[in-house]
């Protein structure tokens, strides 16, 4: 099994470290050639936290947006954390257009405020159990379509969800010592390959 990690900007190294600890091979995808070269071998894709506007621009500049979108729509499992969640959203409240736009949800960028407003909590996540959650200027999922399953909420806000092959979190599971969500994603990837 090999998981691709979008490595244009953001917390991609932290995701690679978690996958390594779980014994799963990962590959950093920095450009279209990387993606096309590894696409047939990929069991899944991680879109890390970072700055979503910058990542969206780089995806367009590297001509990666449409090929990644097509792969996701064709069933490639994807795990978007924080900025990765924003990349997957069909609608972003403060922007005219979405980026990949594959997941039926509306999100509000930086809803948890400035970096100083970042926080840590623990909450139940459906199918995973109680997990630590680190929020750094995280987005809020303000609404979801009928096919989207809400996995976790904090203070009545949706912070984790899944729609078919797409898993998203408003928080950064890669910044904790808990690998349960990554393991959940790996199981999604295994199911898809069967």
UniProtKB/Swiss-Prot annotation:
EC number assigned by the record: 4.3.3.6, 3.5.1.2
Annotated protein name in UniProt: Pyridoxal 5'-phosphate synthase subunit PdxT
Keywords, in A-Z order: Glutamine amidotransferase, Hydrolase, Lyase, Pyridoxal phosphate
Residues bound to L-glutamine: 50-52, 109, 136-137
Organism: Streptococcus pneumoniae (strain CGSP14)
A GO term from the CC aspect: glutaminase complex
Subunit structure: In the presence of PdxS, forms a dodecamer of heterodimers. Only shows activity in the heterodimer.
Similarity annotation: Belongs to the glutaminase PdxT/SNO family.
MF term (GO), any: glutaminase activity
Matching InterPro entries: Class_I_gatase-like (IPR029062), PdxT/SNO (IPR002161), PdxT/SNO_CS (IPR021196)
Function: Catalyzes the hydrolysis of glutamine to glutamate and ammonia as part of the biosynthesis of pyridoxal 5'-phosphate. The resulting ammonia molecule is channeled to the active site of PdxS.
Swiss-Prot/TrEMBL catalytic activity: aldehydo-D-ribose 5-phosphate + D-glyceraldehyde 3-phosphate + L-glutamine = pyridoxal 5'-phosphate + L-glutamate + phosphate + 3 H2O + H(+); L-glutamine + H2O = L-glutamate + NH4(+)
Superkingdom of the organism of origin: Bacteria
Pathway in which this enzyme or protein is active: Cofactor biosynthesis; pyridoxal 5'-phosphate biosynthesis
Positions annotated as active site in the UniProt record: 82, 172, 174
